[in-house]
Every structure is written in C-alpha cells, then in structure tokens.
C-alpha cells in the first residue's frame, strides 16, 4: 500500500509523542515494583487515526522505549522487560523482548483493527472510541501482566520473596 507524505509525517509526529512520554514522568510513572505507563494512549490514538500498521509501528517504538527505560533505570521487575537483565539466558532474552516490544505492538494492531471493525459495522463513533480506548488499555495490561505471569512467575516470586502460588494474586493486585 502506498503511503503519502501526510501519513508518514503523522506517524512521525505520533512517534515523537510516544518517545516524549516514554522519557518523562508523565509517561513512565515510577512505582516501587514496576513502571506504570500512559504511553499506550498515543499508540491507541495513532492506531485509530492512522490504522493498525501505524499502531504497530507506534507500539514497537513504545516497546523499544520501555526496553531502554528498564535497562537504564531498572526496577525490581525490569528483568521481565530488558533482555540485558535476563536471569534465564537466551530464553529469558526472547521472553523479555516479547513482553517489552511484542505486547506493545499488539496494542496498536488490536486497537486499529477493532476501530476498523466498528467503522464497517457503522457503530456509534463516540461509543466506538470509548470501547476501542478501553480495549487498547486492557490489551496493554492483560498482555504485559499476563505474559509476566506465564513467562516469569518463578522469577517474579523470587524477586518479591513470595511463594510461586501467590504470584497470580500479586499480579492481579498490581493490575487493579
């Protein structure tokens, strides 16, 4: 598909917003265990305005910024977001890249395709925006926290000094 100059500039502007948010306390909110984020918001907006491919690009930029942030200013759970802090070798590197980049790409892809679906169904635009924004935020939360649970439950338990059986409850507590 041919992309015109306006599209490329729009993606670049949204990417600049993602990078700005990812490198300020407005986007990456430092908590004792993990970094909360608002960076997914421009990814969702970009996916709605520019489509799923732009959403994927913006999500990848968000993920790379997250990877860099967790490498340069680590928290207790940064091993789950940075391949350079992996505790389980090459497998841990791949898992960390999935959590930091892959999950964030999915925000843009799913939000973009959901918006396209709503447009094809001729759904109420206002309600569609609310639902797409909510789903995009939940994709971020569920994919990231779910992947941490599925891929790093043992390391999470060790980092928090709790039993592995308590990890699900702790992750759900972080989500809520």
What are the functions of these language-model segments?
Residues 1-176:
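Loop-helix junctions at membrane interfaces
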């Amino acid at each position: 598909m041919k992309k015109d100059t306006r599209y490329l500039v729009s993606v670049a502007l949204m990417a600049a917003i993602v990078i700005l948010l990812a490198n300020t306390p407005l986007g990456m909110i430092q908590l004792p265990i993990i970094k909360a984020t608002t960076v997914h918001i421009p990814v969702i907006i970009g996916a709605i305005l520019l489509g799923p491919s732009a959403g994927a690009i913006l999500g990848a930029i968000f993920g790379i910024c997250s990877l860099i942030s967790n490498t340069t200013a680590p928290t207790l759970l940064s091993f789950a977001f940075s391949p350079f802090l992996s505790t389980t070798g090459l497998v841990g590197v791949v898992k960390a890249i999935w959590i930091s980049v892959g999950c964030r790409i999915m925000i843009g892809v799913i939000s973009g395709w959901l918006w396209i679906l709503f447009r094809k169904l001729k759904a109420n635009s206002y309600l569609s925006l609310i639902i797409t924004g909510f789903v995009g935020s939940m994709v971020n939360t569920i994919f990231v926290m779910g992947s941490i649970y599925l891929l790093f439950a043992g390391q999470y338990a060790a980092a928090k000094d709790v039993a592995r059986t308590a990890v699900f409850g702790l992750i759900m507590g972080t989500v809520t």
